[in-house]
């Protein structure tokens, strides 16, 4: 089949020479063309099987390599899916950890705010109690100093019952 195509192609190439009207009777173009075709046919006969086997082996090598690459691609896609799934799980876990940390921080903040509020209230109560004690102490000292001054002045005379009544009313 190939030889027939080659001969037809050669004849088509020579057709313009025939149409020009040149005298080719003195040339040996036909003999050379036949020798060339014969040479190509013999080469084809001896090399066709080797060429076909070579091309088949190359195509088999290419197909094997393609299959290997496709297998690697499939493994890579599976690994990618697996890693993406792990990434999503890690993101979910991170969000859970963050939300737990926020809740715990809020709880701790509330606890310390409550404790601080209670401490402040206790300090205020203690301060008021200390102030009340100091006021009573100052009143008592003032009353004692006034009574002491009055007793020492001897202008006013008090008995013990009068002192007790006055102290009860003022303190």
UniProtKB/Swiss-Prot annotation:
Major subcellular location class? membrane
Protein localization: Cell inner membrane
Q: Identify the InterPro entries for this entry.
A: ATP_synth_B-like_membr_sf, ATP_synth_b/b'su_bac/chlpt
Note the Pfam families from the entry.
ATP-synt_B (PF00430)
Gene Ontology cellular-component annotations: plasma membrane; proton-transporting ATP synthase complex
Q: Which domain of life is it from?
A: Bacteria
Q: State whether keyword Transport applies.
A: yes
Keyword Nucleus among UniProt keywords: no
UniProt entry keywords in alphabetical sequence: ATP synthesis, Cell inner membrane, Cell membrane, CF(0), Hydrogen ion transport, Ion transport, Membrane, Transmembrane, Transmembrane helix, Transport
Q: Which residues cross the membrane?
A: 2-22
Q: Which CDD domains match?
A: ATP-synt_Fo_b (cd06503)
One MF term in the entry's GO annotations: proton-transporting ATP synthase activity, rotational mechanism
Q: Provide the membrane topology annotation.
A: Single-pass membrane protein
Database matches in HAMAP family: ATP_synth_b_bprime
Family to which the UniProt record says this protein belongs = Belongs to the ATPase B chain family.
Provide the assembly information: F-type ATPases have 2 components, F(1) - the catalytic core - and F(0) - the membrane proton channel. F(1) has five subunits: alpha(3), beta(3), gamma(1), delta(1), epsilon(1). F(0) has three main subunits: a(1), b(2) and c(10-14). The alpha and beta chains form an alternating ring which encloses part of the gamma chain. F(1) is attached to F(0) by a central stalk formed by the gamma and epsilon chains, while a peripheral stalk is formed by the delta and b chains.
Q: What biological function has been recorded for the protein in this entry?
A: F(1)F(0) ATP synthase produces ATP from ADP in the presence of a proton or sodium gradient. F-type ATPases consist of two structural domains, F(1) containing the extramembraneous catalytic core and F(0) containing the membrane proton channel, linked together by a central stalk and a peripheral stalk. During catalysis, ATP synthesis in the catalytic domain of F(1) is coupled via a rotary mechanism of the central stalk subunits to proton translocation. Component of the F(0) channel, it forms part of the peripheral stalk, linking F(1) to F(0).
For this entry, the protein name equals ATP synthase subunit b
Report the source organism. Answer: Helicobacter pylori (strain P12)
User: Corresponding gene?
Assistant: atpF
